[in-house]
């Protein structure tokens, strides 16, 4: 419901959506841009990639525990959603307004979305090269 409400109000500002399931960030996030990247390839332009800001969202304690028990954090992003169940790629100049709209929806939905949080966690940019592998299509920066 919250995503539908956002689409009703901001459809022209939403460029991609993805449900982050098994396969984590690396397998799911690149699926947001297949048509845009096909077009960019035909135009001789570099593909779009996603760059996420480390520490921009709270990673649930279960993943910290897995890391403490020896799981490699970078590989966990290839398996788990790391607390991000759904992502929207939106116009940068509308991002904060959309985050606020999600918060307003959650606050006024009789508690059904009380645990839902929205935040800006990264950006979409043109790759500096071909970006053929998943690791080249999804980057993390400090």
Question: Each predicted region: which residue ranges?
Answer:
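Glycine-/charge-enriched secondary-structure boundary and capping motifs
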Residues: 1-142
């Amino acid at each position: 419901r919250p995503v539908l409400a956002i689409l009703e109000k901001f459809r022209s500002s939403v460029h991609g959506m993805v449900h982050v399931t098994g396969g984590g960030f690396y397998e799911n996030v690149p699926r947001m841009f297949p048509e845009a990247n096909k077009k960019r390839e035909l135009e001789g332009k570099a593909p779009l990639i996603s760059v996420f800001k480390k520490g921009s969202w709270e990673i649930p304690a279960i993943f910290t525990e897995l890391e403490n028990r020896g799981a490699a954090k970078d590989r966990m992003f290839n398996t788990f959603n790391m607390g991000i169940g759904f992502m929207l790629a939106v116009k940068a100049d509308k991002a904060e307004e959309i985050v606020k709209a999600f918060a307003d929806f959650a606050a006024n939905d009789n508690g059904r979305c009380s645990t839902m949080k929205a935040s800006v966690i990264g950006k979409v940019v043109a790759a500096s090269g071909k970006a053929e592998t998943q690791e080249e299509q999804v980057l993390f920066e400090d």
